[in-house]
C-alpha cells in the first residue's frame, strides 16, 4: 500500500473508476465498515505500507484494489490469513460470487475455509503438484 488516501490506494489514481465503484469494492472486501468509521473516510491517508491500519485492514484494502477493476483472473496468495473468521467468510463469499460472474480465481492458502469455495483443489507437497478430488 502507498502513503496516500484509501481511495487512491484502491483505484490507483485512475479517475475513470468512480467513487461508487470504489465503495462497492470496499464493501465486497469487508472493508467499508471500518473505512466509513474513519474521520476522513476514503480520504484518510493510511501511511507508508498502510502502517496506520491493522494487518487485516491492510489485506481488505488490497483485496478491494484487486476487485475494483472487474478482473478476469484474480490470484490470491494467503488473502484471508490475517482476518477474523467473520471477515474471512465474507471475503470468501465475495470471491465465490466473483467466480459466478465468470472471473477465474486462483487462491493459494493454508486456510481450509478456502476449500469451501473451490471448484478444484490442488496440493503441492514435496515438490509434487497433484489434483485432489473435491
Where are these regions (language model features)?
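ABC ATPase nucleotide-binding domain helical subdomain, centered on the C-loop/LSGGQ "ABC signature"
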Residues: 7-48, 92-93
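Conserved signature/switch motifs of ABC ATPase nucleotide-binding domains
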Residues: 69, 101
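Conserved catalytic segment of ABC-fold P-loop ATPases
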Residues: 116-123
Amino acid at each position: 500500500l502507498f502513503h496516500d488516501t484509501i481511495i487512491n490506494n484502491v483505484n490507483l489514481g485512475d479517475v475513470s473508476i468512480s467513487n461508487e465503484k470504489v465503495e462497492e469494492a470496499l464493501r465486497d472486501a469487508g472493508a467499508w465498515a471500518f473505512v466509513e468509521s474513519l474521520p476522513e473516510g476514503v480520504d484518510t491517508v493510511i501511511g507508508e505500507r498502510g502502517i496506520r491500519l491493522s494487518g487485516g485492514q491492510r489485506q481488505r484494502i488490497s483485496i478491494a484494489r484487486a476487485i475494483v477493476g472487474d478482473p478476469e483472473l484474480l490470484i490470491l496468495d494467503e488473502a484471508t490469513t490475517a482476518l477474523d473468521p467473520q471477515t474471512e467468510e465474507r471475503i470468501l463469499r465475495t470471491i465465490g460470487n466473483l467466480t459466478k460472474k465468470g472471473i477465474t480465481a486462483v487462491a493459494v492458502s493454508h486456510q481450509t475455509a478456502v476449500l469451501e469455495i473451490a471448484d478444484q483443489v490442488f496440493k503441492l507437497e514435496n515438490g509434487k503438484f497433484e489434483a485432489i478430488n473435491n
